[in-house]
């Protein structure tokens, strides 16, 4: 499968993703008790401990019953290969965030909003939110449609 990355910082600087001033943890919907997997996160990616709610648990795939997956990806091929496998690890009300490089980032990619959206929709999920993860990465949130949620693995 894909590798894990990312870290936590205790530097005291809050990761204010994008331009809204809202901490990333809040933007992507991390709540108390969430089970989260960071997949292919860049080595310099971090959440500040003070922005995380209590009892958040970071786990490694192939863990199941995940509330949030944040998947960093640079190629359409990798996204197509791993999207459905990762989405199958979600709880019925879980979400998968796909993070791909912004055009302005200088990071090589063949992904765009339209390609990311198409792959997610083709996998049976629906996109419901977009955000700036940071100065390099855009993120698109996918969830299962309400009518499909009873058939998804539950906690």
Positions of the model-derived regions?
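Conserved beta-strand signature within the Rossmann-like core of class I S-adenosyl-L-methionine
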Residues: 93-101
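Short acidic low-complexity segments
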Residues: 55-66
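A short glycine-rich, Lys/Arg-flanked "PGG" loop and its adjoining helix->strand segment in the class I
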Residues: 83-92
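Short, Lys/Arg-enriched N-terminal segments with co-localized hydrophobic residues
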Residues: 3-15
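Class I S-adenosyl-L-methionine
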Residues: 26, 124-155
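A short, conserved alpha-helix within the catalytic core of class I
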Residues: 77-83
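Conserved Class I S-adenosyl-L-methionine
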Residues: 110-129
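N-terminal, charge-rich interaction modules
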Residues: 12-49, 55
């Amino acid at each position: 499968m894909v590798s894990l990355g990312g870290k936590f910082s205790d530097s005291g600087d809050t990761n204010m993703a994008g331009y809204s001033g809202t901490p990333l943890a809040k933007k992507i919907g991390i709540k108390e008790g969430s089970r989260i997997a960071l997949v292919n996160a860049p080595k310099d990616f971090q959440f500040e401990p003070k922005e995380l709610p209590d009892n958040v648990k970071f786990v490694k795939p192939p863990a199941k019953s995940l509330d949030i997956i944040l998947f960093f990806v640079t190629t359409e091929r990798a996204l197509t290969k791993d999207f459905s496998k990762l989405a199958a690890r979600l709880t019925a009300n879980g979400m998968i965030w796909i993070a791909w490089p912004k055009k302005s980032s200088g990071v090589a990619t063949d992904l765009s909003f339209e390609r990311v959206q198409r792959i997610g929709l083709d996998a049976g999920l629906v996109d419901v939110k977009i955000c700036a993860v940071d100065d390099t990465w855009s993120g698109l949130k996918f969830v299962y449609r309400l009518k499909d949620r009873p058939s998804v693995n539950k906690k």
